[in-house]
């Protein structure tokens, strides 16, 4: 994105707006190895931030440039401003030139609260195609597909109070938001923490395949309906390198189930392939939702109010179909189903422990292909251990089903 999400598309109003998010900056060329110099505008060389850095506008790290952020640094950012990385950012990782961050010495990006708007005043996202009036809209960190992946690392980084940046992910007006955006970018992010994010913590698209390890994530908190899953991925991880979410914890809000409840999944994937291992999803309405997606969910604990793991259809790419593997998990929805496989999903569920489901079944299968082996299902308070309907192809062997309604 220069910043246009679909470079082959002609510029529309939304694309022009997105460019304005990043490019309407006063450009200054810092000296080589500058320290805490560029508070807004463009970094074109190498700059190091340490201690406290107070930004006063949008920042662009240009292609070929490098921003180094040392351990313990606090970056204060105005409410609706963002950082766009087209070159590289090395935050808290000694392998790329920064001092090593840790739990006791993290790097903190803190966005301020917006000023109270005057009558009829709107924020920078109130343009045709987006129409979001929030005064904080547009804040976050954007990692472009042009980044130097060999020099880019994020370690023990906290994003606090970002609203999220709106992005047209397909050039057709499909606007999604993210506080930390991976636009075709694939890099390692270790021990990230997200706090008070209005929309979505992480948005990955355009073939992005980041590895997120040891993270603390929260479902969006926006009260005007813009809140989203903690992680959203569209067309991510479908190449030779898959997207990974490892050793991470997710929390949110336990709203009522159903379309009127307003709840969001902790993880939402569409047309993506993602490896998820050793996750904890608790205190939220829904767990993970995979639409036309595949991958792995293993060695995890999913405790939700509504459905824990939803799948709809499967990922198909390059003439191949891909299975979603759900294995060795403890799955405990209070009211909803443990696992659903709907409308062409291809699922292998093995060695899971599923219980709860006061208003659902352990596995709900409709018009899908499911292999379920060596699972322990029950007690189930709602309906059945396995509820199969439609023209489904199901193989279930060596399961233990007990105490169903």
Where in the sequence are the language-model features?
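Secretory targeting signatures
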Residues: 1-34
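Beta-strand/loop edge motif enriched in small/polar residues
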Residues: 29-405
């Amino acid at each position: 994105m220069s910043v246009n999400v679909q470079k082959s598309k002609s510029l529309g109003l939304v694309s022009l707006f997105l460019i304005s998010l990043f490019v309407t900056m006063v450009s200054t060329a810092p000296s080589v190895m500058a320290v805490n110099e560029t508070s807004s505008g463009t970094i074109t060389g190498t700059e190091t931030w340490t201690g406290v850095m107070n930004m006063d506008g949008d920042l662009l790290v240009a292609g070929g440039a490098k921003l180094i952020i040392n351990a313990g640094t606090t970056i204060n950012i105005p409410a609706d401003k963002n950082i766009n990385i087209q070159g590289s950012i090395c935050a808290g990782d000694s392998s790329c030139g920064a001092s090593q961050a840790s739990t006791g010495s993290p790097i903190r990006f803190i966005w301020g609260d917006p000023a109270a708007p005057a009558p009829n005043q709107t924020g920078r996202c109130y343009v045709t195609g987006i129409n979001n009036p929030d005064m904080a809209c547009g804040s976050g960190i954007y990692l472009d597909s042009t980044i130097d992946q060999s020099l880019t690392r994020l370690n023990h980084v906290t994003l606090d109070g970002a609203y999220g940046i709106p992005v047209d992910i397909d050039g057709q007006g499909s606007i999604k938001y993210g506080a930390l955006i991976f636009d075709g970018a694939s890099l390692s992010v270790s021990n990230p923490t997200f706090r008070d994010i209005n929309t979505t913590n992480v948005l990955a698209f355009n073939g992005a395949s980041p590895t997120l390890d040891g993270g603390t994530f929260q479902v969006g908190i926006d009260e005007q309906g813009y809140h989203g899953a903690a992680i959203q991925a569209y067309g991510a991880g479908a190449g030779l390198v898959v997207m990974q979410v490892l050793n991470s914890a997710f929390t949110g809000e336990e709203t009522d189930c159903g379309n009127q409840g307003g709840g969001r999944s902790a993880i939402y994937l569409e047309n993506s392939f993602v490896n998820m291992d050793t996750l904890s999803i608790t205190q939220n309405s829904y767990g993970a939702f995979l639409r036309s997606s595949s991958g792995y969910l293993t060695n995890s604990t999913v405790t939700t109010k509504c459905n824990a793991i939803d799948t709809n259809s499967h990922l198909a790419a390059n003439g191949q179909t891909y299975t979603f593997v759900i294995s060795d998990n403890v799955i405990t929805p209070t009211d909803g189903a443990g696992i659903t496989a709907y409308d062409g999903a291809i699922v292998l569920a093995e060695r899971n422990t599923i219980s709860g489901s006061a208003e659902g079944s352990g596995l709900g299968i409709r018009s899908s292909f499911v292999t379920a082996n060596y699972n322990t299902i029950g007690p189930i308070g709602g309906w059945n251990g396995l509820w199969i309907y439609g023209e489904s192809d199901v193989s279930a062997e060596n399961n233990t089903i007990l105490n169903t309604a």
